[in-house]
From Swiss-Prot:
Keywords: Ribonucleoprotein, Ribosomal protein, RNA-binding, rRNA-binding. GO terms for cellular component: cytosolic small ribosomal subunit. It holds the Pfam family Ribosomal_S6. This is Small ribosomal subunit protein bS6. Binds together with bS18 to 16S ribosomal RNA. It comes from Photobacterium profundum (strain SS9). The lineage of its organism: Bacteria, Pseudomonadati, Pseudomonadota, Gammaproteobacteria, Vibrionales. One of its GO terms (biological process) is translation. The gene is rpsF. Belongs to the bacterial ribosomal protein bS6 family. Residues 104-147 have a biased composition (Basic and acidic residues). GO terms for molecular function: small ribosomal subunit rRNA binding; structural constituent of ribosome. It comes from the Bacteria. InterPro entries: Ribosomal_bS6, Ribosomal_bS6_sf, Ribosomal_S6_plastid/chlpt, Transl_elong_EF1B/ribsomal_bS6.
Amino acid sequence: MRHYEIVFMVHPDQSEQVAGMIERYTGSIKDSGGQIHRLEDWGRRQMAYPINKLHKAHYVLMNIEAEQSVVDELESTFRFNDAVIRNMIMRAKNAVTEPSPMMKAKEERFTKRDDREERSDRSEAPRAEAPAKAEAPAKAEDEAAAE
C-alpha cells in the first residue's frame, strides 16, 4: 500500500454536508483495508482566486495509506460529486501524522484567545468602588435656590 495526501474543496453552500462526506470517504478507505493517518477539517476559507465565481470553500485534508484501486475510486467520487469544487491527490513517501501548518496556526489562535479570555476574567474581579460624587450637583442647586 502507498501513502497519499488528499486535499479537497467543497462548495461553501454544502458545508453542512462535509461531515457526511468525510464519513463516507473514510468508510470506503477503511473497508478496503486502508488506514487514515491524518484527517483535518480546515473549515471555510478564502480561496486564492475565484473558482466558478466562488471566493470561499470548505477545505479538508487527509493523509491515507491505501491501494491504488481505492484512490481511483475516491478520484471518481470527487469528479462526479458536484459539491467538490477541486481536489488534489498526491503520492507521499511516508505517513504524515503531525498537524499541518494550517492546524498549528489555528491552535495558536485558540490558545491566544483563551489567554485573552483568562486575562479579561481576572480584570472583571470585584474592585473597590469609588465614592459617589452626588454632593457636587446638590451644592449647585442650593446656590441657585438661594439667589
